[in-house]
C-alpha cells in the first residue's frame, strides 16, 4: 500500500510483522508471527504516512497465551462435535467458523508506543467480543459504513485508511456499539 514519504531503506523505520518467536519485554509476553501482520502493517504504514508520523517502527505478533486460549476453545468443545456444529478443519473459500465459535471468540490487542529516545511511552488495550476474523470484523465494517453515512468524516480526499478517514469518530462508534459491550478501549500506562 502506498505510503507517501516512507523511506523503506531507513534503518530506523520498519513496519512489519514479527519474523520469529520472541519475548517482548515491553508487553511482557512470549509471541510468534501473526499471519495477518503483512497486511495490517501496510495499512498502519499508510495511516502513519498520511498523518505525518513517519519514520517509525511498527511490529506485530500474537502472544502464545492467545493461541493457547484459542486452542482451549476448540478442544473444550470437542472441536464442535459436542455442540452439533463441527469446526471445518479445511474450510472452503468464504466458509467461516460455525456460529457458536464466532460468538465464543474474542480478541485483545495491546499497543505499546515509545518515542525513539524512550522518554515517553503509552500502553493501550483494545478488547472486543466475537471472532475477530468474521463476527467482529463484520460489526466493525458495519460501523465504518454507518460512520461514513451518518457522521462527519475527514474532509480529506483520496485513498484513505479507516484511521485517517474516521479516526476518533470510528473509535467512538466502536466503543458505543452494543451499549458498550462490543469493544472497549483502555489506556493502561
Residue ranges of model-derived segments:
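C-terminal catalytic/substrate-binding lobe primarily of soluble NAD(P)-dependent oxidoreductases
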Residues: 1-189
Amino acid at each position: 500500500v502506498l505510503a507517501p514519504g516512507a523511506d523503506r531503506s531507513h534503518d530506523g523505520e520498519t513496519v512489519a510483522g514479527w519474523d520469529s518467536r520472541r519475548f517482548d519485554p515491553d508487553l511482557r509476553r512470549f509471541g510468534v508471527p501473526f499471519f495477518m501482520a503483512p497486511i495490517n502493517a501496510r495499512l498502519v504504514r499508510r495511516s502513519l504516512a498520511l498523518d505525518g508520523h513517519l519514520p517509525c517502527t511498527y511490529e506485530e505478533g500474537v502472544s502464545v497465551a492467545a493461541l493457547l486460549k484459542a486452542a482451549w476453545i476448540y478442544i473444550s468443545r470437542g472441536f464442535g462435535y459436542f455442540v452439533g456444529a463441527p469446526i471445518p478443519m479445511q474450510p472452503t473459500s468464504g466458509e467461516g467458523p460455525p456460529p457458536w465459535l464466532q460468538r465464543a471468540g474474542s480478541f485483545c490487542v495491546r499497543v505499546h508506543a515509545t518515542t525513539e529516545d524512550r522518554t515517553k511511552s503509552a500502553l493501550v488495550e483494545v478488547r472486543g467480543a466475537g471472532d475477530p476474523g468474521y463476527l467482529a470484523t463484520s460489526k466493525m465494517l458495519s460501523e465504518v459504513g454507518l460512520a461514513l453515512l451518518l457522521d462527519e468524516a475527514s474532509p480529506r480526499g483520496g485513498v484513505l485508511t479507516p484511521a485517517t478517514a474516521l479516526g476518533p469518530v470510528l473509535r467512538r462508534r466502536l466503543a458505543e456499539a452494543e451499549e458498550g459491550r462490543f469493544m472497549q478501549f483502555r489506556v493502561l500506562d
